[in-house]
Design a protein with these regions (language model features):
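Catalytic core segments in nucleotide and nucleic-acid processing enzymes
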Residues: 10-12, 50
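Donor nucleotide-activated moiety binding/catalytic core segment of transferases
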Residues: 19-71, 76
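A short helix->loop->beta-strand "cap" motif at the edges of active sites that frequently abuts
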Residues: 9-10, 78
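Short hydrophobic signal-anchor/transmembrane segments that target glycosyltransferases
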Residues: 1-8
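C-terminal alpha-helical cap of glycosyltransferases
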Residues: 141-164
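Short internal beta-strands
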Residues: 13-17
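Catalytic binding pocket for nucleotide-activated donors in carbohydrate/polymer assembly enzymes
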Residues: 68-142
Length: 164
């Protein structure tokens, strides 16, 4: 909610793995705030197959936890920020996976807010161009990927680092 208030010109669509929590009385006040907000809604249509992919493909920015769809979006050059904190934890998975040199991990709300504002000011093409090195480091992004050679190069690099 705070992010949507800070970015009134952006439209936020929240998509969850499961939505059964929407019927829990504890969340009633938060849900009421979301309903009142003009630039935020919860995607609750689970009858259509692959709606998450449709939402991602039409988004200016994807904010997600560490998920496979987040990786898929990054591999296509979509602007992604990784929400890697909760009420009492931060850096839950980024201590293992950091995606450097990509600056996409958010360990607290201030980082999420700052990075969101920055990304919303640029185009997807600009995001992709500015992050080409990091995107190419983690994903097979050539038009005709030679998967076998790419994997072999990565394995060789790992062996060199391990001095094996």
């Amino acid at each position: 909610l705070n992010l949507s208030k800070q970015n009134p010109d952006a439209y936020f669509i929240l998509r969850y793995k499961k939505i059964n929590w929407l019927h829990i009385n504890f969340f009633k006040d938060i849900l009421l705030e979301i309903k009142k907000a003009k630039n935020i809604k919860i995607s609750n249509d689970y009858s259509k197959y692959n709606i998450s992919y449709h939402l991602c493909s039409s988004s200016d920015l994807i904010i997600a936890k560490f998920t496979s769809i987040m990786d898929e979006c990054l591999s296509l050059g979509f602007p992604v920020l990784v929400h890697d904190y909760s009420y009492n934890l931060n850096k839950t998975l980024s201590s293992c996976i950091d995606y450097k040199p990509l600056d996409i991990i958010c360990s607290n709300f201030d980082e999420l807010s700052d990075k969101t504002k920055k990304i919303l000011q640029i185009s997807q093409d600009q995001f992709e161009n500015e992050n080409k090195e990091g995107l190419n480091k983690y994903f097979l992004r050539t038009k005709k990927p030679d998967v076998k050679n790419k994997i072999q190069l990565i394995v060789n690099e790992v062996y060199k680092e391990l001095n094996v």
